[in-house]
Amino acid sequence: MKTFLVYNTSYFGDTILTDALCRNLKRLYPESRLVFVSNKPFTDISRYMDGVDEVWTYDKWGIHKGLAGWYKFYKEHKNQYVFDAAFVIYGNERGILLSKFLGAKKIYADNRHAIVRLLLSNGKINYGKWIHVQDRHAYLAELYAGKPMESMKIRYHVPDEAFAYINEQLLKGISKPIIGLNPVTKREEKDLKPDTLLALAQKIKEAGMIPAMIGAGKDCESYYENLPPADRQVLLNLVNKTTIPQLGALLKSCAVLISADTGTAHFALALDVPVVDVFYLNDEANLAAWGPKAFYRHRLIARGGDFSAENIWKNTQDLIAENISL
């Protein structure tokens, strides 16, 4: 049985996109064991991704910060496995060194530093036709196996206890269809315009559905609190009400997610939840790598498109109609 190490200590969306690599490794080596090194805040993303057997939490802003923290992490995990191969996302140099120290027989990564590349089993990577980030992650499996990778959907398995919380507590007594609204991003200029959000909420309500605002963090709280008090009463406020697995269960309860945030959008797609992406700053050409692949149920409204509430709602209705017809 082969044992693999996948290292990605990046953020929410980056982590979930790595599942394309994990699923390809499991497709090629069904009996293998896959260990995923994850950034601490996103451990519950990697833990329930399809193909992941075990998660090691890297607390890069806490006990594993800096070189001393890196060495502590190494000592915590040395000699646990003999890794047949390690796959280091974004060519992270600490991840490459860790893989070497842990004794990985082969290491695959996209890193162009002349010295670091001496540690890798691959040369400069020619991705050929693969443009999307998730496919480029998965291509590392092809380099190791010598067999073609498949472009496939990312998947996340929501644990039963998360569904129990959503169904028995958070959404208890709610029977109307829910439309998720995720307006807040890491940059204010990318956030869904408040006027657009409120216009959408009204359209959702008029259609007999419930507009639910989701998200986490102080910025999401501030966004909601800064809405006019009378208007925000239309929204079901679910900000900071869930853990990551519970958010997964909540998204599964939504007919559609309307999202300005890429990470949450990718998460919804991993759950097979239809998504309307609203990206103000990037056009479709710029999103060729990071935007959703065609096999996901989604609509993309990018720079140069129609960002009116009417158009966003039309795209939402189209997705709902397509889902009903399936």
What are these regions (language model features)?
Residues 1-326:
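Catalytic machinery of carbohydrate-active enzymes
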